[in-house]
Amino acid sequence: MAKVAVITAPGCEEGETLTIVDMIRRAEIPCEMVGLEAEEVAGTHHIAMRCDTVFDGSLDAYDMVVLPGGYGGSDAMRDNASLIAALQKAAAEGKWVCAMCAAPEALGRAGLLEGKRFTCYPGVKDQIENAGTWVDEAVVTDGNIITGQGPALAYAFAFALVDALGGDSQTVKNRTIYYNVFDVAGGVPSWETEAGRWPAPEGEALAPKPFHAEKVAVLMPDGCEESETVQIMDLLMRAGLTCHSFATGKDQWVHTMQGMTIKADRMFSPDAVADYDAIVVPGGRTAAAPLIASDEVMGTFRAFDEAGKLIGGLCSGTTVLEASGVLAGKRATGYTGYGAKLVSSQFVADQVAVWDANVVTSQGPCAPYPFAFKFMEALGINPQPIKDRLLYDKASGR
């Protein structure tokens, strides 16, 4: 079976990196995170990840090599002569060589884009050496080179990699509710919220901030959905919020649902999160039960609710909110079939993200973007500039 290396460099985009690994592993294709310089790597948002192995100058064991984006990570890969030589060798042997966002800079340095159609983040296209023909497309395949455009297109890019290896991307898309989030047929629905429309029509003031938050706590139990957790933190930090992750298990290094290891910022306790303005619980099939069994976690959600603080839950994280009682009588959504689990709520099956009172909920693994954007709206933050920078509308995100 084909084997994939995802090069993980200091300053990489954590959301891109983990989403790519997540989706490839869901397709049951062996995939390793390969640290460019060390086993432990901190990304652009200072989230620490522990890789499966460290690059030793050779990529011979792999059938596909993938370079995620992030300005710092892309620079490190571009300037690593040993990696450039290994990429050249892999490409010459007909192996798949893939890069997204700013990382095609490394392919340019390796001379792999000459005479090729390719894409990358629009802001770096003029910096790429030995470039072929840049095209304004989400994902481009030319021969054995696959390139992708930007952060919000990490899902589409990952599925293109799965398809190239003969994997079953359709099943993964269905299970991760990809089509609930991304209208790949084209056309981006208007973004209506309970707080108003973004951006506001000319002459109309933006909706007032119904909640105030500067600090957001994100719970990180063992078995959590890594791409959900990290992507939510990424987006909230881009909105200017201070965002810390809290390990709820016995160790600050958290073992996640798809076999990755991520370091939480802090250990959880009710006192540790008491001065935070908002709290979020992501999903993960095995992650919810220990949280529900924890009196400290349940008490924390009730305390946030009683204080009128903003609370968020995604995917199976919504069952944690249900167990704590904070969904009672509120409109909420969750993963497919969760209407039978979120029984105290007014379940909304046809909306990917819902905000009611002080609770924001969303549906599943591909929904961190609409969840985070809805969370921003609940805080009176206009998400459109962030959507623009991340090419969310290019991904036809709802």
Where are these regions (language model features)?
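Active-site-adjacent substrate-recognition loops and nearby beta-strands
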Residues: Y121
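Glycine/proline-rich loop-helix segments at beta-alpha junctions forming the active-site rim
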Residues: Y335
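Short, thiol/selenol-centered motifs that function as redox-active sites or metal-ligating centers
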Residues: A99-A103, G313-G317
